[in-house]
Amino acid sequence: MSSEEPPIKKQKLELSDPDEPLTQHDVISFQKEALFRCLNSKRVELEALTKQYSTVHDKWEQNVHTLATLMSVLSTAASHLRGLCNEESEKTLCDEMINAGESVDKERTDEFLNLLRKYTNSNGSSDSKIDSLGLELQRANKTKSELRLQNKKLTDEIDSLKAYYHGLVRSYDREDSMTVKRVFNKQKTDDNTDNISNTEQRPTSVSPVLTNGATHVKNEVKTEQEALNNHTDSSQSSGITEEEKKKLFLQYENKITDLESHNSSLNRIIEELENYKQLNEKELAQTRLEISNLLSEKHSNEEEREDLLHQIEKLKASNTDLTLTNESFLSKFQELAKEKDTFQEKISSDFEKTLESLKAQNLALEKDLVRVRTTRDELISKVAILEAETSKSVLISDLKQALDILRDQWEKIEFRNNQSPSSDALLKEIQDLESAFKELSSLTHKKYSEYLNHESVISKLTIEKTKADQKYFASMRSKDSILVENKNLSKSLNKANELILQLKDTDKLYKQKIESLHKQLALSQNNEKRLVDSNKAANLKVMNLNSEIQKQKKLLDFTSSQKNELINELTEANGMLKSKELEIEFKENELQTALKKNEKLEEFLSKENYNMNKPSSLATTNLDEDSMAEELENFRTLVYCSLCSKNWKNMAIRTCGHVFCEDCCKERLAARMRKCPTCNKPFSSNDLLMVHL
């Protein structure tokens, strides 16, 4: 935002002379800049959290997509398995898994897996494969736990890195602040060469322990605030002479020069720690890349390693250039932050003005909305009354039309009776029709009167309902206005409570800062020892990482061998599938031949019936009655159903190939007798096939 906005020059702070004692204005400006630095750090943390949230949200969407695909696969498997089930409980379990969605119970999934194993074992799969898969699952869980521990270690290191960089940014902000320099009486001097040379004699090849880097920054703050307290105490004391004041001033100046030299040496150590940390990060990245390449290539060449080492050296050189550019960007960032303060003040004032105008507009709109709602309710009640009246008129017109039609029909019948010769039968029919017509008309009149009464009751109720609705809406509008007033009052009360809490928090923070300054004095003496210990710990970490890399390589080789075994098992399963498909084709061919035989037998039967009907063939048929009876019985056994011996065979079972009639098959399915009566093989409704003989 600050790069796109026009640069606004910040007003220069009016600080007192450094030779004079501190004033109240200096302390207030110092506190304001400290608050600004705190707000800026919180803003940076918020931006980082938003980025993390976006990445986590994308991963969540991917997981939802994969879960949906897995659930679709599970539902298809359950629907296929439902046809093989014989018991009702198993079918209900399959239906639950089909309609489960994303909420699946663990106990029900275990039952479904047991059912799946039951039917897969019946189809010919072996238990050895299941045991091998279970062992592989245990190994995968073991590797998962190891990776989880590594993830914890890496997250701890990342947290320490974040804390370290936050401390660095805070120290840079404090160094560039004019109020900090004024309060702690910092001046740019070049008399610190002796102290810097003493600090350079210390060991520089220390490890990048991030917590110790942060304590250096804290020591700087601690010494500066101690000097401020001592300076204010000395200036406020009344019984001190001018000579003693000068001596104290010289002592403070000497302390400040010592602290500045110590600060410069600490900054150099921090830079060396940063370089060493970045080198370690690059080496870790390179090792991770090598591990990922080992998944595709088992043996790596020495030439590639040498190239990687050259690339690391080039990256080191580019890293030094980037540190210089980073420092220049930090200075620019601080200038832009100062300009941003003034711009934000202007924006806040404009925002308050626009907010007040919008509140006034909102009140006017709320009044208009109440007026529109009242008119709307009145119109709705009128429309309901009109609709009730129109429905009555339509029904009356329909009844009149029905009566007119009946009268026309009656006149036509009378006219026909007058033209035709009179007879007793017709007179009786006419009398019956007349009596029926009278009964019908009386019934219609009764129904019509009942309907009118019902409609009048409904119209009264609708009118009362509209009145009640109007009262309800009026009460709701009054309730909304009361709720708005309550919200405004609660907001004002919350703001007052927040101000009280903020004042209490500031008091607590000042007390905590004083206590932390006393504690940091003791910690500053042990910084050098901690740096040496941290160097040793970092070397041990590097050794552990190398050992872990070798373990990961071994795990990769083991997983590749397991992968090959699984591929072999898959090929065997595909071969079994192909053999089953060939068996199905053979069964279909047999079925087609049986159908052809049935067609030939039908033709033969039709010919025999034709010959039986001829008079010349009666003599010959009497001779061959026994043979024909046998042939007819054989034909019936082939064509008619063997269960009922009434219907034709028109339904075949796919699992075994036996043929029965459709009625018998449906009766057996309805009675839950789902086994073939000839071979006792199980079948379902999906295994039935229509056959046309």
Curated annotation (Swiss-Prot):
Subcellular location: Nucleus
MF-aspect GO terms: DNA replication origin binding; identical protein binding; scaffold protein binding; ubiquitin protein ligase activity; zinc ion binding
GO biological process: double-strand break repair via homologous recombination; meiotic DNA double-strand break formation; mitotic G1 DNA damage checkpoint signaling; mitotic intra-S DNA damage checkpoint signaling; protein ubiquitination; regulation of DNA-templated DNA replication initiation; subtelomeric heterochromatin formation; telomere maintenance via recombination
Biased composition (Basic and acidic residues): 1-15
TM ranges: none
Catalytic activity: S-ubiquitinyl-[E2 ubiquitin-conjugating enzyme]-L-cysteine + [acceptor protein]-L-lysine = [E2 ubiquitin-conjugating enzyme]-L-cysteine + N(6)-ubiquitinyl-[acceptor protein]-L-lysine
InterPro entries in the cross-refs: E3_ubiquit_lig_Bre1, Znf_RING, Znf_RING/FYVE/PHD
EC identifiers of the protein: 2.3.2.27
Pathway per the UniProt entry: Protein modification; protein ubiquitination
GO cellular component: chromosome, telomeric region; HULC complex; nucleus
Zn finger spans (RING-type): 641-680
Matching CDD domains: RING-HC_Bre1-like
Keywords: Chromatin regulator, Coiled coil, Metal-binding, Nucleus, Transferase, Ubl conjugation pathway, Zinc, Zinc-finger
Protein name (record): E3 ubiquitin-protein ligase BRE1
Species for this entry: Candida glabrata (strain ATCC 2001 / BCRC 20586 / JCM 3761 / NBRC 0622 / NRRL Y-65 / CBS 138)
Source species taxonomy: Eukaryota, Fungi, Dikarya, Ascomycota, Saccharomycotina
Encoding gene per record: BRE1
